[in-house]
Amino acid sequence: TRESFRHTLEEVVKCQPARLSIFNYAHLPSRFAGQHKIKEELLPAPAEKLALLQETIEFLTAAGYHYIGMDHFALPDDELAVAQRAGKLHRNFQGYTTQGDCDLLGLGVSSISMMGDAYSQNQKDLKTYYAQVESLGHAQWKGCSLNRDDLIRREVIKRLICDFSLNFAAVEQAHGLVFKEYFAEDLKLLQTFIDDGLVRMTEEGLEVVSTGQLLIRNIC
């Protein structure tokens, strides 16, 4: 309930952790057998989860935390908060980070690696994982290499997620394109969020307002 979750937040804040990562529970009983014990009808509805997130943001910011975005909070002097204020924050599939240009090597079942412009995932089944390591010397199951369009979109998404704003000129200079022409179809799709007051668009760029930040995944 909202009351019990608020109590949890109150207890956590007493410990003053430098960072907090708070995200939705993913109910996937078909993949995780132990989740069959959880009654799905007792889980909060999407609207309730959104309300929980809003109240969490309000509570933690009142307690002195900076809302980094999506699922992360940090104290003002934490390096994530410092990097965001300086426009140097990054995000990968592990979360927010100050290390933007590092390769990530995933170790273990189902882990994901990011090496240069390529992503790969290890085998998800333990027996298959071990068998493939023995036979091939690696556990890679699938992967993909990013093309130019993927790289451009990755950078645009990263800036929106990290800064909640986007400068058209910066993207144009970095990638040699005209933003409103290259993203013409995407801007049409974004119009719904603009009409709802969640995103502001000017001649210079985009800004995601505070209420829109709750839906940054959808906006991206």
Feature roles, as predicted:
Residues 179-194:
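Short amphipathic alpha-helical interaction segments
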Residues 194-204:
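A short, conserved structural fragment
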Residues 1-180:
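C-terminal scaffold of the Radical SAM
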Residues 205-209:
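Minor-groove-contacting beta-hairpin "wing" of winged helix-turn-helix DNA-binding domains
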Residues 211-220:
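Short, amphipathic alpha-helical interaction segments positioned at domain boundaries
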Residues 158, 169, 188-191, 217:
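A generic structural signal for well-ordered alpha-helical surface patches
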